[in-house]
């Protein structure tokens, strides 16, 4: 199934918000093979929040569910890394072009995801990294996921 077929499976409300173009790095079949659940939360996460993200991500992998997150520091990084370490699959939905790791300390993780899992962006190479990209990324993440688990978030969070 290609992205055009995937688009046809969306509801009218979902189609309204689906990005015009998506860029892929990695195994596109992850969008179609299994169930997908987003695990998201604060960049300034607590120890307890990180532990919850780890437990939930391990549990999702155990049930053959793909872990989706946004590659931000904190909860997102823990979700991706735990899925990989647990032998599962992960999808990173980026708020930057595929060639721009954000945060920079996730450069190695992004490369691993692009090689062995899937990274998705709706932003072409050369597109500037701007704060407004990240809520757009969050909407795309929700559109490709069957469910979203919010681990922890502040009142000003883009996760809300």
What are these language model-derived features?
Residues 1-54, 58-62:
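Short, positively charged patches
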Residues 57, 68, 72, 76-155, ...:
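Phosphate/pyrophosphate-binding betaalpha-module
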Residues 65:
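Active-site oxyanion-binding pockets that recognize sulfate/phosphate
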């Amino acid at each position: 199934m290609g992205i055009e077929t995937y688009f046809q499976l969306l509801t009218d409300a979902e189609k309204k918000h689906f990005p015009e173009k998506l860029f892929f790095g990695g195994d596109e079949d992850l969008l179609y093979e299994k169930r997908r659940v987003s695990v998201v939360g604060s960049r300034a996460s607590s120890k307890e929040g990180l532990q919850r993200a780890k437990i939930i991500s391990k549990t999702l992998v155990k049930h053959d569910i793909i872990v989706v997150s946004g590659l931000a520091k904190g909860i997102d990084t823990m979700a991706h890394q735990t899925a990989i370490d647990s032998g599962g699959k992960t999808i990173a939905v980026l708020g930057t072009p595929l060639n721009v790791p954000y945060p920079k300390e996730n450069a190695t993780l992004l490369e691993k995801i692009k090689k062995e899992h899937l990274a998705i962006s709706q932003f072409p190479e050369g597109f500037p990294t701007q704060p407004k990209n990240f809520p757009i990324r969050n909407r795309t993440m929700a559109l490709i996921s069957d469910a979203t688990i919010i681990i922890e978030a502040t009142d000003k969070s883009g996760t809300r």
